[in-house]
Amino acid sequence: YYVCLRRHVLRIQDPRGEVYGAVALTVVTLGGLLSALVIRVVTAFLHRPAAAAAISLQISLLTGALLILMVVLSQVTAFTPAVEGPDPISELRPVTVNGRTEWLSLRGRDRSKPVLLFLSGGPGGSQLVTARHCFADLERDYVVVTWEQPGAAKSYSAINPADITLETYLADGAAVTEILRREFGQDRIYLMGESWGSALGLMMAREHPEHYRAFIGTGQMVDFLETERIDYQMALEDARRTGNKKLVDKLEEQGPPPYESGIALKTNAYLSPLYGTSARTGQLRGATFSTMEGPYGVEYGLLDKVAFFWGLYQTFDSVYGRLY
């Protein structure tokens, strides 16, 4: 309702605002309803006759059960849309990876085609919907598998973000690769990574070159700290050039990376303005999809939608500083 109101009544076309608002409203609404239930139950017993209190309790419990059912149904009915083809595959499923439950999206028009494993950006990022949208053409010639890495959206609960290390990603990546090699009967698969995933992919290929036909990097990262220093300086120079004193003061106050704490918020302070700069200067043009539309996807239940943002924040904040 919130999204429809913004788009069709108020005529506001702002995917990022819609996502943040919709998730916030979901959390606030569910939290408020559950809090109201507790208050209602307590007051029912304190201020009402026994019969009225019993009826009120029954109504409250029923409402609570319906709310829980709504959340559960949203989780268990999440899916990836069907793919048409001679022998198609379109599955969204959990897999056991080194004793933990993580998620895979598998999509392709012919399951006999070579497997292409895609590693999302992050750490903590989820690109199930982005991959489905952007890699539709690849599904003709490959079985495109998107791995929800530990700490990201649907795989958020696989492990405490504070316990994730680079070795965790490498071990889990090797295990996912082995699952795919065994299931599809392929000695070697293709590997592709975006941003953080491009660095992870290089390291996975270095450890097990015998498992991969080729590696494809997009937004390739090779030096985490140098990347952040360059991004920080670019954002600071652009803020000075455009007279954005508030941003200049904020960036100068926090200083350049590396950071020992508050990494997610400090990194976002200069990365977020850079995205706007790229669009304003024409460096980014012709885009057909925004990553911020991702949480709308049918791949995510209500809890997943919350974890989409919380997982990125928590996991990035816990892991990224250790990659410097």
Regions found by a protein language model. Give the residues of each.
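Short beta-strand element of the alpha/beta-hydrolase
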Residues: 113-122
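The serine-hydrolase catalytic nucleophile loop
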Residues: 126-135
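Glycine-rich "HGGG/HGxG" loop immediately N-terminal to the catalytic nucleophile
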Residues: 128-129, 151-164, 226
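Conserved alpha/beta-hydrolase
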Residues: 139-156
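Conserved acidic catalytic loop of the alpha/beta-hydrolase fold
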Residues: 168-188
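Short glycine-enriched nucleophile-adjacent loop
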Residues: 198-210
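A catalytic-pocket lid/entrance helix-loop region that shapes and gates access to the active site
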Residues: 207-260
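Alpha/beta-hydrolase
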Residues: 238, 242-324
